[in-house]
Amino acid sequence: MIENWPQKPEGSQWTDDQWKAVVANGRDILVAAAAGSGKTAVLVERIIKKIIREENPVDVDRLLVVTFTNAAAQEMKNRIGEALEKVLIDGPGSQHIRKQLSLLNKASISTIHSFCLQVIRGYYYMLDVDPRFRIANQTENELLKEEVLDDILEEEYGIEDNSIFFELVDRYTSDRSDDDLQRMILALHTESRAHPNPEKWLDKLVEAYDVEGKTIEDLVYASYLLEDVKFQLETAEKHIRKATELAMLPDGPAPRVETLQADLALLGTLSSAARGSWTSVYEAMQNVSWQTLKRIKKSDYNEDVVKRVDSLRNKAKDEVKKLQEELFSRRPESFLRDFQDMHPVLEKLVKLVKVFTERFQAIKRDKGMVDFTDLEHFCLQILSEQSEDGEMKPSAVALQYRNKFAEVLVDEYQDTNFVQESIIKFVTKDFESEGNLFMVGDVKQSIYRFRLAEPGLFLGKYKRFTQEGSGGGMKIDLAKNFRSRHEVLAGTNFIFKQIMGEEVGEIDYDADAELKLGASYPEGEDVAAELLCIQQTEEEVQDGEEGAEVEKAQLEARLMAQRIKAMVDSGYAVYDRKTDSMRPVQYRDFVILLRSMPWAPQIMEELKLQGIPVYADLATGYFEATEVNIMMNVFRVIDNPMQDIPLAAVLRSPIVGLNDEELATLRAHGKKGSFYEVMSSFLKGAPLEEEQELHDKLEWFYKLLQGWREFARQQSLSDLIWKVYGETGYYDFVGGLPAGKQRQANLRVLYDRARQYEATSFRGLFRFLRFIERILERGDDMGTARALGEQEDVVRIMTIHKSKGLEFPVVFVAGLGRRFNTQDLMKRFLLHKDFGFGSQFIDPRKRIKYTTLSQLAIKRKMKMELIAEEMRVLYVALTRAKEKLILIGTVKDANKEMEKWLDAREHSEWLLPDHIRAGASCYLDWIAPSLYRHRDSEMLLELGQGNIPGEIYEYSASWKVEVVEGKDLLAPEPVQEEKQELLEALRDKKAVPLESERKEEVYDRLMWKYGYEDATSHRAKQSVTEIKRNYQSEEGSDNAFIKKLRAPIKTRPRFMEKKGLTYAERGTAVHAVMQHVDLKKPITIEVLQEQIARMVNKELLTFEQAEEIAIEKVISFFDSDLGKRVLAAKSVEREVPFTMMLSAEEAYQDWQGKKGESILVQGVIDCMIEEEDGITLIDFKTDTIEGKFPGGFDQAKPTLEDRYKVQLSLYAKALEKSLKHPVKEKCLYFFDGNHVVNIEE
């Protein structure tokens, strides 16, 4: 129980709260772990402590650990495995720890879906499902849904007496299609599956529209909207109070005070009615009458103050007017009539959803496939049964799991949904006060509501649990951040203390939620957080809204490029924890975070123009790639050659190679009919002499096309694709174009996608093309195949969602002026987990439509949830930075925006007014008003502290706030008219007259010789091994670079693979063993065998490599004098990688190029030992020596010294440069014969 917690050890690295999270038990525990607070380390330590404790240790397979991703589950297993191995070192005889290591692989450490799969596999006989089922591909799932839905609607259209269905169709479809109705059915199906009992949720949705015998006060929508009415009236009241304050200033329009006070009285009456009922507000709204403002002579008063007073009063009147128009222009009973009228239609809609769900499940069952929601619901079906009162209760299987699991630990709990919560509930104990559920997460980082994650589950427990755990569950706050500098944390806290609250934001950013400094950094320069606001003037914007967006992306990209280049060129210093020192910033240290990726291509282009290497994992552009587009058109033509546009595209492409004139000639042969019919007719006749070339091209293609069409009917799609690649030569052709490897990779991806498609339940080319269309309709373009890896030294661009869990020294958060995506709020129908279904009232006979109460309530609720989600997304973005945070946004009229943001300066509390926070349309609407209350904004505003409380104005954060003129970032228009004419002449292949002033320049360029020709035949980066070979070669390095380009050696055929490992593979295996051998244990055959087995288990060695290792030779080394020195050394480092700069003359014997040139050398040192009198370098060799030299080892020794002298000299030089200590001895150790060779200079 709680009283028996172990005390935190002396000198422990854990904070008090972390230790509490590690050892607390006896009830359900919720750990609210802030960004960078070490939650994974805490979770692993808790598991380890449970496994290794002396009293009642728990077997690892009696713990259920639920992670958010498979990668996180694997990392968790690895960490636990490493921790157990460390424990085993201290107590090698512990059978319990050995048992845990053997149980680890089958322990329940996985995603919730993997756990569901485990339950279903074990109890499939309780379900109507084939035990050999497979997980459905997402696109395959969508196509199946489409098929099922088409069949259902076709049946409904065929029923004669089906008036309610046709009423539904009339209301929710257009003249052209019933796509909207299909979308409604699919959306309701998806939303229902996010609930433990989908049918029950659907039934409640219909019940909400059954208003027989009810008043408007009984409707949940009305009660919710009344709260919103109060909110808007409070906002209006604040505007009038502020206007009154301004009017009463010495230079304010005092005559208007009387009118403003009457306004306050009117708003007070409305607010009083809102505290009553809907009807009372309706009646009060009918009597609203605003007094006319008294005329004043504006010159007698401060004109700006008068404008401000009038503006605030107009805002207040607009708030009331909006309420009148949206909610109180109709009598309450008319809203009830809407519900009555829509009830039978909605009932029919829900019936269709239920039929669809039943049929869809049946077809998946027939095809032996399930999707991820099926996994959750099937698992829940096994774990639950219905009680007498109709509620769900644990089944016998669930009780078995309860007995099995000593504790259930859930990572990223804030991203759990209702179904997953039910599954977890059924395998854990009933009562929170005696529970065994341990949950870790941060609701401030819950950013997956679009995946139906429910942050309310976390929030409910956080509010309910106490820090003492009295009477229920316990909550523990981990607020210390071990990732970021003080400036990043203080800057983030300063913003979120002002914008995140329970009413707007769903959680209070209080003292417990604030980020607290846990990391230590050396003093740094220029580490203040920054806000750069770009002013985009109207003149700079072209092509309307779309042009403005492109312009914003370009402006922000240029500003970021300037900053990145400046920071890299100046050697801006960042802290490197590995070396515990400051180092110059590299491109890999930068990340650019975006809310979504539409701007990414423009930003990439701008950065590349500035010479900045950049990488973005774009999920778009694949099907737009020219080579993919052409191939897709080929397949469309194979499927149906009567399609003119695809066929014309193929004929015009390099595959056939017709030019515009030839295409026109072909069309002229038949003005009617399709291109294909014209082509067929043209090929049947005898061509004119001038048309012979055209005839030959078309004949070649026509024969291929007929062959492909026949092949497509009989063979697999993937074989067809490869056949087309080969017979057209197009795959080889694109390989010769610029970015050829990328293009070929794209074509291979298309082939792979066809293979994936063929693994589904669909077949054939037509279905494949439909499959691809569905991908594009869903917006799931795949992105081009990767040509640049994520580990390169490049600036990364990614979405904020992708960055979650990552950290970077320098973070740019861009696009902060882009509007929030509110498209979901504009749909014809809305769905909500609590409020169900809402849509416009549509009367097709009268041709009228208007907003309903349910639609207004759901829209308001979804808007507030969207605002809360966007706050959490911003929090994730800001907390990725370790050392430097730079925020960038663009506005069209900075002065106008600043005037709006300055409203916040008058507010006297930390949390900004609700209407400012709820009315935000972009991130800048939160960030700028917050920063305008900080002293560091004075560099921009020069307004003084005013009424801002000192604790806010003087808050310890450091900020730089700057407005950047967009016109200063735009490059001048390129190129003079003369140059343009020259380019056009060259493009048209016309002779260019050479004027005398250009003559010398042209000749110089034509006769130019590259000044570093020798460098082209020598690599700028070499490995030590390559340099060694260069010195051994009689030819030196002449043409060595060209030799590297020879065709790669093919993989050994399978019939040769059985003959064992190559010498190189054996050597690699021995080096791996020497790297991992535990020097603290006695080096015996048993210990080495156990170690090799562990390495095989971890996939560090293959079984074949393990069998080939001569253990006795490893033992011989440690029995030798040199091996004993290794065991006795002060410190031992193995497999030490290094890079260093070396002069080209040292690296290449034949270097004739410029003196002073350097090359980058890289290598790995096998072993270095530090003894009392210095450092010794050891290189292990597996060369075969015995029997190869007639004179034995004495004859071999000079040859071996000569062979490896250069290599070890370079190793020694690298060590001496990095360690600043001389290497006293360089040794070669040969396992064959147990020989040691000392290398002398």
From Swiss-Prot:
CC cofactor: Mg(2+)
Protein EC: 3.1.-.-, 5.6.2.4
Swiss-Prot/TrEMBL keywords: ATP-binding, DNA damage, DNA repair, DNA-binding, Exonuclease, Helicase, Hydrolase, Isomerase, Nuclease, Nucleotide-binding
Any GO molecular function: double-stranded DNA binding
Superkingdom of origin organism: Bacteria
GO biological process: double-strand break repair via homologous recombination
Domain UvrD-like helicase ATP-binding: 12-485
Domain UvrD-like helicase C-terminal: residue ranges: 505-805
PROSITE patterns noted in UniProt: UVRD_HELICASE_ATP_BIND (PS51198), UVRD_HELICASE_CTER (PS51217)
Cellular component annotations (GO), alphabetically ordered: cytosol; DNA helicase complex
Catalytic activity: Couples ATP hydrolysis with the unwinding of duplex DNA by translocating in the 3'-5' direction; ATP + H2O = ADP + phosphate + H(+)
InterPro entries from the UniProt entry: AddA, DNA_helicase_UvrD-like_C, DNA_helicase_UvrD/REP, P-loop_NTPase, PDDEXK-like_dom_sf, PDDEXK_AddAB-type, Restrct_endonuc-II-like, UvrD-like_ATP-bd
SUPFAM superfamilies tied to this protein: P-loop containing nucleoside triphosphate hydrolases, Restriction endonuclease-like
Pfam hit, one: UvrD-helicase
Positions bound to ATP: 33-40
Matches recorded under NCBIfam families: addA_Gpos
Stated family: Belongs to the helicase family. AddA subfamily.
Subunit details: Heterodimer of AddA and AddB/RexB.
Role: The heterodimer acts as both an ATP-dependent DNA helicase and an ATP-dependent, dual-direction single-stranded exonuclease. Recognizes the chi site generating a DNA molecule suitable for the initiation of homologous recombination. The AddA nuclease domain is required for chi fragment generation; this subunit has the helicase and 3' -> 5' nuclease activities.
Protein name, as recorded: ATP-dependent helicase/nuclease subunit A
Species of provenance: Bacillus mycoides (strain KBAB4) (Bacillus weihenstephanensis)
Gene it is expressed from: addA
